[in-house]
Regions:
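Conserved inter-motif catalytic segment of the P-loop NTP-binding fold
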Residues: 91-166, 170, 177, 229, ...
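Short, small/acidic-rich helices and loops at N termini and domain boundaries
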Residues: 2-44
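Hydrophobic/aromatic beta-strand patches that form the interior of the parallel beta-sheet core
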Residues: 67, 96-98, 128, 187, ...
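Short, well-ordered alpha-helix to beta-strand connector turns
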Residues: 64, 92, 148, 219-222
Length: 237
C-alpha cells in the first residue's frame, strides 16, 4: 500500500492532530494510520520500515549474492521482495519473480499495493506462478539472463514440498552455484518457525527459520528479518 506522504510527514500530522483535538498521540497516530489504510500505527510503521529496508538491502546486493528475507505472515517479506524487484528494474536490471504461493493476478495486486503498475515493466520482469517452480526450472528459464538480474523466489519452504522435486538443500546449492556463475542475485523469501517468541527477541534471526527439511543456512550471503517494523540486515562474515 503506497503512503500518501513520507512517514515523518505523517507523524508530524499526527502530532498536530493530537494538539488540535487534545487527544493522546497514540490515538492520533492510529487515526492517521487508518486514513492510510492500516488498522493501527504499528502496521503503518512496519510498512514504512519495510520500504526503507528494501532500498538498503538492494544497495548492498552484488552479482552472485544469495540472500534471504524472513518474516512471519503479514510482516512484509513479500512486499519487500517486490519492492527490491522494482528497485532493480528502475536501476536498469532485469528481474524475475518465481512464486509457488500467488497467482499472476495476486502478483499484479502486490505491485499495485506499492503504487506500481506491473505493466510498466513489461519486458523487464519474468514471472512464473506455475506449480513447476524449482531450482531446475528457474535455472532453465534464466539461462540467458544478463549479469545483475535480480531473482525473488517465493518461498523457500515450498521448493521441495512436492516429493518428485530434489531436496531443498540440493536446490539451494544449485541456485547458489548458478548465481555465482551467471552473476545474478537470488533472494529467497522464508517463513519463520512458530516457536519464535517476539517477547524474548524483538526480531527473528537465522535460528528462527522454519526448516522442515535440512539446510545449511551458511549458504546465504545476506539476510534480512522483519517483525512489526523492526528490521535486521546482516551480511555473512
Amino acid at each position: 500500500m503506497r503512503l500518501s506522504a513520507p512517514i515523518y510527514h505523517l507523524k508530524r500530522r499526527a502530532k498536530l492532530l493530537s494538539r488540535e483535538q487534545k487527544i493522546p498521540l497514540h490515538e492520533a497516530l492510529d487515526r492517521i494510520a487508518t486514513e492510510e489504510g492500516f488498522h493501527h500505527c504499528s502496521l503503518l510503521s512496519a510498512r514504512a520500515a519495510t520500504t526503507t529496508a528494501a532500498a538498503k538491502l538492494f544497495a548492498q546486493l552484488r552479482p552472485g549474492d544469495i540472500a534471504l528475507i524472513g518474516a512471519r505472515p503479514g510482516h512484509g517479506k513479500t512486499l519487500m521482495g517486490v519492492e527490491i524487484l522494482v528497485e532493480a528494474m528502475k536501476a536498469g536490471h532485469r528481474a524475475a519473480f518465481f512464486t509457488l504461493e500467488f497467482t499472476e493476478k495476486d502478483v499484479s495486486d502486490l505491485f499495485r499495493s506499492i503504487g506500481v503498475d506491473m505493466a510498466t515493466f513489461d519486458g523487464h520482469l519474468d514471472l512464473d506462478t506455475s506449480d513447476t517452480v524449482s531450482a531446475d526450472s528457474i535455472m532453465k528459464r534464466l539461462v540467458a539472463a544478463p549479469a545483475g538480474t535480480t531473482v525473488v523466489i517465493d518461498y523457500l519452504q515450498l521448493l521441495d514440498q512436492q516429493r518428485h522435486k530434489p531436496a531443498l538443500a540440493d536446490q539451494v546449492q544449485a541456485l547458489r552455484a548458478f548465481a555465482r556463475d551467471k552473476g545474478v542475485v537470488v533472494i529467497f523469501l522464508s517463513q519463520i518457525d512458530r516457536s519464535y517468541d517476539s517477547s524474548s527477541k524483538p526480531c527473528p534471526d537465522i535460528e528462527d527459520l522454519r526448516l522442515p527439511n535440512p539446510l545449511d543456512v551458511k549458504v546465504f550471503s545476506k539476510t534480512c528479518f522483519l517483525h512489526e517494523g523492526t528490521v535486521r540486515l546482516r551480511s555473512a562474515s
